[in-house]
């Protein structure tokens, strides 16, 4: 054991570096070859008169900013309350600091020099645009950083703070009438482009990724023309949620006029008439009122505002528009299953004829489409359908970038028999199984090694194939089409 060599190796890591606003100091991760910079500001606090505005630039600071701890999470319902599946799985700390001043990001890097130019992952968390934060255990970027990428997790405003619309907002700031959370994500990406070289990252090799609402956020960023040239690849995990049996999709952006009416109703519920009054209220009072409001009204999320979001990002992808980059997307096997509601075979035939017209017989010729469950007939993953439809459309419209589909179907242990539930794949992509309460065993860790290696290869090259980090050749993963 050579203590001097260990100390020398630690000194060779990037523990301190500069950003456009000042110096930052990180902290060694559990693996001393990795430096974690937590709570790095990328925009000014969206508080006071900056509430419900596009993110503004940070002010410069003197000295060295200590970035050893995570910054407060964005204002939302208090995490960690109750014994639901997701509280048990992720939101385990009801005392986690929370503040409207929340526009910070976190960086994990194993670079030894600012000249390393490592590929970069920019991650957006999920939570239905209502909840979620970067300090969730599963998003620890250390394991991925060990494989030679720089990992960045971006915090953003959620719920009413991130997605309020109102006629007064549209009139006062037509350049940014809504989608403040999406603009936070975009500002985080732009900060990475400008600053990540000082953390050993390559600003010309950035993959954006996210899960659930984070995956839908990736779709929104790909649809934004202003991001042209900033994104070299994308991963959408469980973020395209549709159904072959319905005309509408879950999470389709809200038209501005509809969103403005929801905002007007909320102001009335809040007991205010003007933006000035609303901006003067305490953030936690607004949060609590919004939670009550959402019991009987639609929640606030992405809006077709004509500026950041000009149309449905999924529709744009189907038509071969938006940023065309290598794309990986998929789903877990037990999430968002859709069914045909029918009580027997006769009613199934009638429903099939309504849905598929002259192709009903062809649909029913597949035995799996006659399968009946307690929820109905013909169970199918709405996400799998949506992803494959998008991939086929990309190909048909002339996109020459590869599309890689995955279906995550691991056995998930635990007394709750939760199945392959929505979000369980996050432990595997980030290879953070050891942080979870579930009794994962050796074959789960082997699977996580393979999955994270596919993910890292994709970040590095736009192609998941190659070797895992132990230099074992991975099974070939062919493009979907």
Which residues make up each language-model segment?
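Short, Lys/Arg-enriched N-terminal segments with co-localized hydrophobic residues
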Residues: 1-12
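Active-site rim elements
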Residues: 91-95, 174-179, 246-254, 369-383, ...
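Alpha/beta-hydrolase active-site loop
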Residues: 175-197, 257-261
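Substrate-access "cap/lid" subdomains that shape
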Residues: 194, 220-223, 228, 233, ...
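Alpha/beta-hydrolase fold nucleophile elbow
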Residues: 200-211
């Amino acid at each position: 054991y050579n203590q001097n060599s260990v100390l020398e190796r630690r000194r060779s890591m990037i523990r301190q570096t500069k950003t456009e606003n000042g110096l930052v100091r990180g902290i060694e991760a559990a693996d001393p070859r990795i430096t974690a910079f937590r709570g790095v500001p990328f925009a000014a606090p969206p508080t006071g008169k900056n509430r419900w505005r596009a993110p503004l630039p940070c002010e410069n600071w003197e000295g060295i900013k200590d970035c050893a701890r995570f910054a407060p999470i964005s204002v939302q319902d208090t995490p960690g309350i109750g014994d639901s599946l997701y509280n048990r799985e992720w939101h385990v700390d009801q005392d986690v600091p929370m503040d409207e001043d929340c526009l910070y990001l976190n960086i994990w890097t194993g670079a030894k020099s600012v000249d390393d130019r490592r590929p970069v992952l920019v991650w957006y968390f999920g939570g239905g645009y209502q909840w979620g934060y970067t300090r969730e255990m599963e998003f620890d970027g250390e394991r991925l950083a060990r494989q030679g990428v720089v990992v960045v997790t971006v915090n953003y405003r959620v719920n009413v703070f991130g997605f309020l619309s109102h006629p007064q907002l549209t009139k006062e700031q037509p350049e940014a009438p809504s989608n403040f959370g999406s603009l936070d994500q975009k500002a985080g990406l732009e900060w990475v482009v400008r600053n990540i070289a000082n953390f050993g990252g390559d600003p010309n090799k950035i993959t954006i990724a996210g899960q659930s609402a984070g995956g839908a956020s990736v779709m929104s960023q790909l649809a934004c023309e202003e991001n042209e040239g900033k994104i070299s690849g994308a991963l959408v995990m469980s973020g395209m949620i549709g159904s072959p049996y319905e005309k509408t999709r879950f999470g389709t952006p809200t038209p501005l006029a509809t969103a403005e009416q929801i905002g007007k109703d909320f102001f009335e519920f809040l007991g205010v008439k003007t933006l000035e009054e609303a901006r003067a209220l305490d953030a936690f009072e607004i949060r609590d009122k919004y939670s009550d409001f959402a019991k009987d009204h639609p929640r606030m999320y992405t809006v077709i505002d004509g500026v950041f979001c000009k149309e449905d990002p999924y529709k744009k992808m189907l038509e071969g528009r938006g940023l065309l980059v290598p794309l990986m997307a998929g789903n877990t096997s037990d999430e968002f299953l859709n069914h045909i509601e029918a009580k027997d075979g006769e009613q199934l035939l009638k429903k099939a004829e309504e849905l598929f017209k002259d192709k009903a017989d062809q649909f029913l010729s597949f035995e799996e489409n006659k399968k009946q469950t307690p929820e109905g007939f013909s169970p199918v993953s709405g996400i799998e359908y949506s992803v494959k439809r998008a991939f086929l459309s990309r190909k048909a419209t002339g996109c020459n970038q590869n599309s890689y589909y995955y279906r995550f179907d691991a056995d998930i242990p635990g007394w709750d028999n939760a199945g392959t539930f929505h979000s369980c794949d996050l432990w595997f992509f980030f290879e953070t199984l050891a942080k979870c309460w579930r009794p994962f065993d050796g074959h789960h860790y082997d699977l996580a090694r393979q999955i994270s290696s596919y993910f890292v290869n994709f970040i590095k090259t736009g192609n998941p194939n190659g070797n895992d980090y132990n230099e074992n050749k991975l099974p070939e993963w062919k493009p979907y089409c």
